[in-house]
């Protein structure tokens, strides 16, 4: 069940079935470091910390801006209401997707720290075990047509839940050791009615394949993408 913790510095929403640690501390990397619970990290726009919870493993991410504006205001956003904050919206969207049967990480906690007219945000979600992103897999070898079909089916489930993934790319598709497909990173994504926008998600995904062919020499072809994009014809 989703619970809420408040104090003078922050507001935290958390799933009490997954979080047995102190909700006031769960989004502080120092808390996990001091308790020897940091398993590793990954660096992208910022650092994602992989941590050991009592019940599961988590991925802790601090929200940061990209682009030129991000160099000026790295991690602060205008506050226009608790339910409009980045971490709360991603936390709730992940719950919506889980309820719809889409393979996404279970959200554990979302934090907002309000400072006057601005806020900072963090998200703690479950780490997908034994999984790699599609880029690293395709750098080593091609994947089967059946695995491409699985990717297409997962996108279909996401679209059936009417979720617009505004940054759908092959870094945000994970494959675990059971060849189960996962979709991650739903920051700034949202529920949208209709169908016209769905093709835009697929076009963005196609561009990411083409980019990584040039950048990293991944094993990929247009025929493989045709298998993914055929998802909309499946029942």
Swiss-Prot record:
Entry annotation: catalytic residues: 167
Catalytic activity: an alpha-Kdo-(2->6)-lipid IVA + ATP = a 4-O-phospho-alpha-Kdo-(2->6)-lipid IVA + ADP + H(+)
Topological type in the membrane: Peripheral membrane protein
UniProt EC number: 2.7.1.166
Gene3D superfamilies: Transferase(Phosphotransferase) domain 1 (1.10.510.10)
A single Gene Ontology CC term: plasma membrane
Pathway: Bacterial outer membrane biogenesis; LPS core biosynthesis
Name of the top EC class for this enzyme: transferase
Membrane-spanning segments: none
Entry keyword set: ATP-binding, Cell inner membrane, Cell membrane, Kinase, Lipopolysaccharide biosynthesis, Membrane, Nucleotide-binding, Transferase
Keyword Nucleotide-binding: yes
GO process terms (BP): lipopolysaccharide core region biosynthetic process
Record's keyword annotation contains Cell membrane: yes
Main location: membrane
Subcellular location: Cell inner membrane
Signal peptide from the UniProt entry: none
Single GO molecular function: protein kinase activity
SUPFAM superfamilies tied to this protein: Protein kinase-like (PK-like) (SSF56112)
Origin: domain of life: Bacteria
InterPro entries: KDO_kinase (IPR022826), Kinase-like_dom_sf (IPR011009), Prot_kinase_dom (IPR000719)
Primary role: Catalyzes the ATP-dependent phosphorylation of the 3-deoxy-D-manno-octulosonic acid (Kdo) residue in Kdo-lipid IV(A) at the 4-OH position.
Cross-referenced HAMAP family: KDO_kinase (MF_00521)
Stated family: Belongs to the protein kinase superfamily. KdkA/RfaP family.
Protein name from the UniProt record: 3-deoxy-D-manno-octulosonic acid kinase
Organism: Vibrio cholerae serotype O1 (strain ATCC 39315 / El Tor Inaba N16961)
Lineage, top ranks: Bacteria, Pseudomonadati, Pseudomonadota, Gammaproteobacteria, Vibrionales
């Amino acid at each position: 069940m989703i619970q809420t913790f408040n104090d003078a510095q922050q507001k935290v929403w958390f799933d009490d079935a997954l979080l047995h640690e102190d909700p006031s501390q769960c989004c502080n990397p120092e808390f996990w470091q001091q308790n020897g619970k940091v398993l590793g990290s990954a660096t992208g726009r910022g650092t994602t910390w992989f941590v050991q919870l009592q019940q599961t493993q988590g991925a802790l991410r601090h929200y940061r801006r990209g682009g030129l504006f991000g160099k000026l205001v790295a991690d602060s956003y205008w506050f226009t209401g608790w339910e409009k904050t980045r971490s709360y919206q991603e936390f709730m969207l992940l719950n919506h997707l889980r309820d719809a049967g889409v393979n996404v990480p279970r959200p554990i906690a979302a934090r907002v720290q309000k400072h006057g007219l601005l806020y900072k945000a963090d998200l703690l979600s479950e780490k997908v075990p034994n999984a790699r992103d599609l880029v690293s897999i395709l750098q080593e070898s091609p994947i089967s047509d059946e695995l491409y079909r699985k990717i297409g089916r997962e996108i279909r489930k996401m679209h059936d839940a009417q979720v617009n993934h505004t940054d759908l790319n092959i870094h945000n598709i994970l494959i675990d050791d059971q060849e189960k497909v996962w979709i991650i990173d739903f920051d700034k994504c949202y529920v949208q009615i209709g169908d016209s926008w769905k093709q835009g998600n697929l076009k963005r995904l196609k561009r990411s394949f083409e980019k990584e062919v040039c950048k990293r020499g991944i094993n990929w072809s247009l025929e493989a993408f045709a298998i993914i994009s055929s998802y909309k014809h499946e029942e």
